[in-house]
Amino acid sequence: AIRALFARGMPPAPAYAMARRNRFLGRWLAHGEGYPDWNVRLFDRRRARWTEDVVHEHVVAEGPVARLDGDLLHASAESIEDYVAKQNRYTSLQAQALHAKGERASFARMALSPLTRFLRFYVVKAGFLDGAAGFAHVAIGAFASFLKYTKLRGLDARRLEGQTAGVDLTRL
């Protein structure tokens, strides 16, 4: 798809997204949160740029992003231990970013965010069709949502106590 795009000359769109297919527990996911996971990976640096987000940086473009055929294959981690450790790091960074923006985590958000995430990706987006790998992928994602807001709540509590400087969120 990329060669065909450039065979016609300079591509017209400022950026192109590809469907990322995630490999998890030895299986290429075809549903749920694992596919299609659209990501911009081809872009004109004059008309698009990476965000400075601490987690899940993405490309923002001046104009509409076009889609390319084909899959971008992505192995998210070597092992389940690595994947869970990565989620722990990401949720710490996400909680810190939300905390810096002044956001707070209510009990309702801690409880409902993981539930709605699980239902959205396992039921609505048919993650159940990916079997045990799909269940594990969505369940870990839902737990990561819980961790993010629980860590944010921990930061909120420390903010009230005036103790947020240098907090290691991987220990919360």
Name the predicted role of every residue range.
Residues 1-159, 166-172:
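Catalytic-site signature of metal-activated, phosphate-bearing donor transferases
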